[in-house]
């Protein structure tokens, strides 16, 4: 407790007199009854919190991390990271019981990359692959790859813009396993391309176990990706997913058998894949296409069209909007500019009905 009565984190001693363990501590509140502290006690709060998380917070020290991260943002700074910090401070005041979690996950870090490394490592660790080891691996990957630093921000923006359940950037970072799955894949993909395939496969296995999402580290996925709900997604080794694609739960981008080589789907920019959609084989789903929930796609889907059913058939065309951005899961006749299927005559499939 600080002299001004503000809420602080206090170290909890075990029988040996050391910190009682990862994430353990108790919240104390002084007679002033304040929320998350004040300027006069900020230093004390930080000092006590750092004592409480001697190894758990940061991994190895990398002094250049913030400077490296700032290399991809313009003179205006890093607005997403600034928003995440502001949101975390506000939430710590509203929910004091989460103060230690928010400090360790966000407020103790100097850039979004470090915060993300911390969050992912503490979700993916196991008894033989420790969080501190993973933090160093993840930091090293992200700090040395401009593409991944750009992608983690564009993905966060995609979650904030397209998922009505994600009201804040910090919610994607801290709580949404769809976001965690995509960023973990991005790290595994970099490791795979560096020739560290065994480590990449170990991460893939752990990601699948923890998040129920199985993305092969060799798959190629663009930026601005929304993986909504983050459960039951499968993306095969030779699959390609373009920029700005939205994928709902239960989507499969799979092969058709035991053949080797290029055997998985290619998804165009701005496509929307509905819940439970299954797309099999080396086929193309065009830019701005929409695959309805529960559909089985075995043939190419034209750009800006909607495919529905099992097996899927093209039912219409919409030229002006990317469904991944509007998130309109809509098969009504009046939604389409052109109708490709007469709903009483499936023989018209694939051609515009005048």
From Swiss-Prot:
<keyword id="KW-0012">Acyltransferase</keyword>
<dbReference type="InterPro" id="IPR042122">
    <property type="entry name" value="Ser_AcTrfase_N_sf"/>
</dbReference>
<protein>
    <recommendedName>
        <fullName>Probable serine acetyltransferase 2</fullName>
        <ecNumber>2.3.1.30</ecNumber>
    </recommendedName>
</protein>
<dbReference type="InterPro" id="IPR001451">
    <property type="entry name" value="Hexapep"/>
</dbReference>
<dbReference type="Pfam" id="PF00132">
    <property type="entry name" value="Hexapep"/>
</dbReference>
<dbReference type="InterPro" id="IPR018357">
    <property type="entry name" value="Hexapep_transf_CS"/>
</dbReference>
<dbReference type="InterPro" id="IPR045304">
    <property type="entry name" value="LbH_SAT"/>
</dbReference>
<comment type="similarity">
    <text>Belongs to the transferase hexapeptide repeat family.</text>
</comment>
<comment type="subunit">
    <text>Homomultimer.</text>
</comment>
<comment type="pathway">
    <text>Amino-acid biosynthesis; L-cysteine biosynthesis; L-cysteine from L-serine: step 1/2.</text>
</comment>
<keyword id="KW-0808">Transferase</keyword>
<dbReference type="GO" id="GO:0006535">
    <property type="term" value="P:cysteine biosynthetic process from serine"/>
</dbReference>
<dbReference type="InterPro" id="IPR005881">
    <property type="entry name" value="Ser_O-AcTrfase"/>
</dbReference>
<dbReference type="GO" id="GO:0009001">
    <property type="term" value="F:serine O-acetyltransferase activity"/>
</dbReference>
<dbReference type="InterPro" id="IPR053376">
    <property type="entry name" value="Serine_acetyltransferase"/>
</dbReference>
<keyword id="KW-0028">Amino-acid biosynthesis</keyword>
<dbReference type="Pfam" id="PF06426">
    <property type="entry name" value="SATase_N"/>
</dbReference>
<dbReference type="InterPro" id="IPR011004">
    <property type="entry name" value="Trimer_LpxA-like_sf"/>
</dbReference>
<dbReference type="InterPro" id="IPR010493">
    <property type="entry name" value="Ser_AcTrfase_N"/>
</dbReference>
<dbReference type="GO" id="GO:0005829">
    <property type="term" value="C:cytosol"/>
</dbReference>
